[in-house]
């Protein structure tokens, strides 16, 4: 990274941490900001293999949950960090109506079906942000399983639905504007295969 990029990235990290504040990851005491930083790190690593991944994609990964979970508007993101960052964050976020029903069990599948439908026609950069998000989440699930935690209790959906969702994401990331040949897609595929082959009785 060039000096000016490091400065901008440092400012962006500070902004993200301020907005997520003291929030924690669902069902744990782990600071929430560790997740967007993990997503950013995945994209930075991918950038070393693909020079087309620019600063906007990295920032979108860092900010991907600001609209959905920290109530930062897409317009605010655009004003502070530009149109492309805002576009990618919007593509990775649930719409307002579904966002309000986030913690309602009956709405889980409806929300995920909406996300999958958007993924069908998504551009490569949007898919990269979403792939990095899912990879960081999948790694967290895998760590919890290895630690002996009943990770599936954190979800507002049964095991089979979660499995369906992650496997559907893999299929859609491979279709259309495919990112199948990226390092992070291959890592996500490995994680998903590992997570869902573990018997549920061994997850807690």
Labelled PLM ranges:
Residues 1-204:
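Active-site helical microenvironments for divalent-metal-assisted chemistry
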